[in-house]
Amino acid sequence: MVVGKIIKISGPVVVAEGMKGSQMFEVVKVGNEGLTGEIIQLTEDEAIIQVYEETAGIKPGEGVEGTGAPLSVELGPGMLKAMYDGIQRPLNEIENATDSIYIPRGVSVPSISREIKWDFEPTAAAGDEVITGDVIGTVQETASIVHKIMIPFGVSGKIKEIKAGSFTVEETVAVVETAEGEKEIMMMQKWPVRKPRPSKGKQAPVIPLITGQRVEDTFFGLAKGGASAIPGPFGSGKTVTQHQLAKWSDVDVVVYIGCGERGNEMTEVIEEFPHLDDIKTGNKLMDRTVLIANTSNMPVAAREASVYTGITIAEYFRDQGLGVLLTADSTSRWAEAMREISGRLEEMPGEEGYPAYLSSKLAQFYERAGRVECLGSENKQGFVCIVGAVSPPGGDFSEPVTSNTLRIVKVFWALDANLARRRHFPAINWLTSYSLYIDDIAGWWQQNTAADWRSLRDEAMSLLQKEAELQEIVQLVGPDALPDRERVILEIARMLREDFLQQDAYHEVDSYCSPLKQYNMLKIIMTFYKKGLDAVAKGADPAGISAVTVKGDIARMKYLTDDEFINTKVPEIINKMESELGALIK
């Protein structure tokens, strides 16, 4: 074991000498208190270490001890419902062990409890041939998730022994005869966070991730296995949007990373999630959630670790054939931590002081999203979706973190402070947002809703763009100076904005909108548009079209349940629309 000595301390960065024989990204214990750090640079016998805990009080001359292993996470039963810090230390366990609301420096608590016994049900038998990724048994970890115990990476052979019963994560549940000898299989694995977990290959992203949010699903859809960015200034609704995604997305597991954000936002998640019901399983949402809390008052170096810890945990669940949503709030804070560490290392700064390798670091993270064919002899498919919030100072989307993120992700949900001030939520700007997955996922929508889904969506988008062009004229001369046809377009665009795009996150029904309901709502508004144009062409007054009472029914449709709306209200609204607009024709 390498033992060195501290020669320099600069905030979270420590320089130690006598470290010959150490490896890059090796975890070390720094100082007399044994603070956790990671080697990020090696020159001859000196090592530069980023420390994941507060360095106040340590001094030159204190020891640095290598562990011989990279920064790794423990993967196994017991992660769901847990709350970790950025380096996978369990916060609840630390509180119980230390009887303190603060994290003591140098504290060491296992990430996964060694005391809890889990009921292991074998799905393989002695004599079976197994390879990396094969499922040999299951554990009912929570009411929502059956945890699959897999053969770890690099192990293949014949099962010599496998037993059912209650075991801790460190006890042997199976023995595999390999070419190198017998290997004992535990329920827990370890994996280095900076190394992506392997798979057989990536699949095309052709299935949409249904979030229940109309603007995201219908207009700017994200595919399963895709990556998305949510940039927006302060108060525009980034965190609530991410909470909505965590609550309603069509996934099996949610990994929520609070990376450098305010502590009260994580508190909201911790207080709210245990009381929320999961629409897929009927159980509590927390049963399928892993929380990583790395708030703004925690050491900056741990922000980078928290992002890698979260994606490694997400990949582990993906390898079980599950769908995972990883939300990182916010990647800007992680980039700011990189900027601080880079400054301490006296590296040449890039744009706005960020390091020159900012884009490659962001790409390494987002590239770990994907829909994959999992390792193993079974035909398992899993996916990881990444949704990263970006907090550009002053809402400036041209700043380096936002612009570099845009080069990597294929979905851009741009939050607009002006919309938020007008109380239009979700405040996703339909003119600046985009999705490059629309062509890929259109087939699924047409198969599961109706063949005209794509044409309705494209027509609605063009109406909203046309409205933006007309607004300049309206502000100069007023709407009455416009031709009748364009006055109808303005009215329909307003209905699209207020009755379709606006959604109440705190309303019992409107918080989640199913794909079929989304299609029918859009269909009704676009039918009103076509019939309104016909009526105007036949002599109806646009002011009369704006005054019909069916518009009230259209405005209320978002608050109706699927069953009531699709089966009862849709034909009623269409009939009422036809009779009222027909009566306007002279």
Swiss-Prot record:
Cited HAMAP family: ATP_synth_A_arch (MF_00309)
Catalytic reaction list: ATP + H2O + 4 H(+)(in) = ADP + phosphate + 5 H(+)(out)
Subunit field text: Has multiple subunits with at least A(3), B(3), C, D, E, F, H, I and proteolipid K(x).
Similarity comment: family membership: Belongs to the ATPase alpha/beta chains family.
InterPro entries xrefs: ATP-synt_VA_C, ATP-synth_a_Xtn, ATP_synth_asu-like_sf, ATP_synth_asu_arc, ATPase_a/bsu_AS, ATPase_F1/V1/A1_a/bsu_N, ATPase_F1/V1/A1_a/bsu_N_sf, ATPase_F1/V1/A1_a/bsu_nucl-bd
Species of provenance: Methanococcus maripaludis (strain DSM 14266 / JCM 13030 / NBRC 101832 / S2 / LL)
Role description: Component of the A-type ATP synthase that produces ATP from ADP in the presence of a proton gradient across the membrane. The A chain is the catalytic subunit.
Swiss-Prot/TrEMBL keywords: ATP synthesis, ATP-binding, Cell membrane, Hydrogen ion transport, Ion transport, Membrane, Nucleotide-binding, Translocase, Transport
Enzyme class (EC, first level): translocase
Topology in the lipid bilayer: Peripheral membrane protein
Record Pfam families: ATP-synt_ab, ATP-synt_ab_N, ATP-synt_ab_Xtn, ATP-synt_VA_C
GO molecular-function terms, A-Z: ATP binding; proton-transporting ATP synthase activity, rotational mechanism; proton-transporting ATPase activity, rotational mechanism
EC number: 7.1.2.2
Entry protein name: A-type ATP synthase subunit A
Subcellular localization(s) per the UniProt record: Cell membrane
Alphabetical list of Gene3D superfamilies matching this protein: 2.40.30.20, 2.40.50.100, Bovine Mitochondrial F1-atpase, Atp Synthase Beta Chain, Chain D, domain 3 (1.10.1140.10), P-loop containing nucleotide triphosphate hydrolases (3.40.50.300)
PROSITE patterns: ATPASE_ALPHA_BETA
GO annotation (BP), single: proton motive force-driven plasma membrane ATP synthesis
